[in-house]
């Protein structure tokens, strides 16, 4: 300790040796001492919504450093080091005092279906400490929420076998690094040399991108076409016939195809990448359960819903309008993310209510927590399944979209809400597969109900035309925007005034809508939109996406996506 005199006459004691020790750079794995639970809380804010949701439903137990000496932990570490060697992920280099990036062990036990899986040990690089990290590209596409339902619909319609394929140690099977990363291996590696990485270990910022680039390169070499509007979807078209496709979500691949696809793609892909598992029949994929039965494909999240937890509420007398504490706000946002994910995949009846709460989090109160718990209770009270069936030849199908709007029912009665439901339909049998549904706040302030309905219809047509073009590209292997020979789009609106404006030559009275109306008419003249029909409100499937409705209204939509019939 040393006494230091300040200019104002005061004196303080400082321990410089301790300060230097605290700020000394960490270069060895033994020096790392981290509270894993605290680090998980801090890092969870930077994770994407899907990762947060899956971790909540399938909790991960972190093994503390004090237990690293145990035999099962040591065995897991040994296997991880063997993976680095088997995938030729590094070269040894003499220790000449080179700058190196710190590494650490992360040992976890993943609980699925109430059973603890074997311990998993991973060597993680402190990629956040890498030099020039701000210049690295780390983006890589993952399948969109609507792509999953579209892919399952096509698989059911074509009679494809659906499989879940997990790539073993995906980052170590990605493209080689194009820069130098030197690390000091852990003591379990039993070497005094440094490692010069050749592959992107876990923690390297662009590891996911390097794996995606390698996967895309291999699939392209095998003859698959990458869909331009969704880079995570690859289709295999041979001699004008669709034989299968691959949907990628990092190292989780959803494959569907016939015998030709299995021979020419799946088997050859297994020769390039080492698979850790291949599942078919019934399996979990990205937090969802997918099963095939009686030529139908079923998608549900029952286990996920069962694991949703209510928000603990301390109910004080006359304090419903009390502002939330920081910890309460964090819990609320977590639950909103979990229910939003559920509403996007299998539960459209929750969309409006959870979106409305999400828009009001800034001014959330104790009453907001109670409202969120009511939504969770509603989610648990219904076990809905989305089913996909064979509709018929693709050339006979149409894309049908329902659009609806509620005028000035958000942001203190200033903003309006739009809702759309998009279906793939066989008009002759009225059999359908649900592809997407959306609830969104209309960004521009609407001056009338007609304005809100027009903007909702415009957004619905954009979504439907986009899906029609993706389907065309999936089946043709390419797309020509100058020749829009895609599936026709049929729109349904319950606004009589909007329908009349589209079917007569009279100019729209509201100037702000003239360009939008003209754009929709142009799509109709080009044949991209086959027709826009009026439908009574009691048959409007999107009605429950724009307002709080009676249970019977939302049950109508749930019944359609479950039974595949209008």
Regions found by a protein language model. Give the residues of each.
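Long, low-complexity, charge-biased intrinsically disordered regions
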Residues: 30-566
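Retroviral integrase
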Residues: 1-38, 488-496
